[in-house]
Amino acid sequence: MFKAIVSADTLGAALDSVSVLVDECKVRLDEEGLTIRAVDPANVGMVDLELSASAFESYETDGGVIGVNLDRLEDIVGMADSGQLVHLDLDEETRKLHISLDGLEYTLALIDPDSIRQEPDLPDLDLSSEIVIEGADIDRAVTAADMVSDHIALGVDPDAEEFYVDAEGDTDDVHLELDREDLIDLTPGEARSLFSLDYLKDMNKAIPKDAEVTMELGEEFPVKMHFDFAEGDGHVTYMLAPRIQSD
């Protein structure tokens, strides 16, 4: 059983954060809220989403797992105006999700969860640097790097206490430095890793510009990015594997 009412903004933000990496996913339901964990087909980008029951206007479930086509569900939720409420009701016999918003009624066929790729484990990494940065600054760095290259280096200079971004193209380069004053917080350590810009651009689309993003970095390690949404009732963790640099 699953019945819920939630604002279209909150549900849309949750779906966006996952759909930038995968087209379908398992949604785990329990009394505390819903969780989604998924990895893209190339095993490069991972997302872990938690949406607390307190993010909903009302929320009832006796637990379970459903499989969802994210593109179709996003299209439906996208029909709602900002601030409108979306009503969700799972029909367990037909395995369909009934969605109603502003007089519109949709019935969404669900996917067998067993046919969806197994959820990944979220590795426990000991990363040397932690940067707390505004979503708008990540957007600026990604946009600048995208003008010259298809990959981006993220690093920390512990001596200068700076977070930096490097992008090197065939002819042009971009370098951006943010010191402690430009950041919300910085725990410096030796860190530099190279990443695919395509993945970072996709993740950036789902990061609110006013979000406080906690970024964890190491030396040729994955980057972890955490941020809250829905007034703290939603939490997203992204992890992106590095590109291995050949000498």
Swiss-Prot record:
Gene Ontology BP annotations: leading strand elongation; regulation of DNA replication
- What are the recorded GO MF terms, alphabetically? DNA binding; DNA polymerase processivity factor activity
Q: Which CDD domains match?
A: PCNA
Keyword flag Ligase: no
Keywords for the protein's UniProt record, in alphabetical order:
DNA replication, DNA-binding
Q: Output the InterPro entries linked to this UniProt entry.
A: DNA_clamp_sf, Pr_cel_nuc_antig, Pr_cel_nuc_antig_C, Pr_cel_nuc_antig_CS, Pr_cel_nuc_antig_N
Q: Which cysteines are joined by disulfide bonds?
A: none
Please name the NCBIfam families in this protein's record.
PRK01115.1-5
Quaternary structure, per UniProt, is: Homotrimer. The subunits circularize to form a toroid; DNA passes through its center. Replication factor C (RFC) is required to load the toroid on the DNA.
Regarding protein family, the annotation reads: Belongs to the PCNA family.
State the PANTHER family in the record.
PROLIFERATING CELL NUCLEAR ANTIGEN (PTHR11352:SF0)
**What does the record give as the function of this protein?**
Sliding clamp subunit that acts as a moving platform for DNA processing. Responsible for tethering the catalytic subunit of DNA polymerase and other proteins to DNA during high-speed replication.
Q: What protein name is recorded for this chain?
A: DNA polymerase sliding clamp
Read off the lineage from the record: Archaea, Methanobacteriati, Methanobacteriota, Stenosarchaea group, Halobacteria
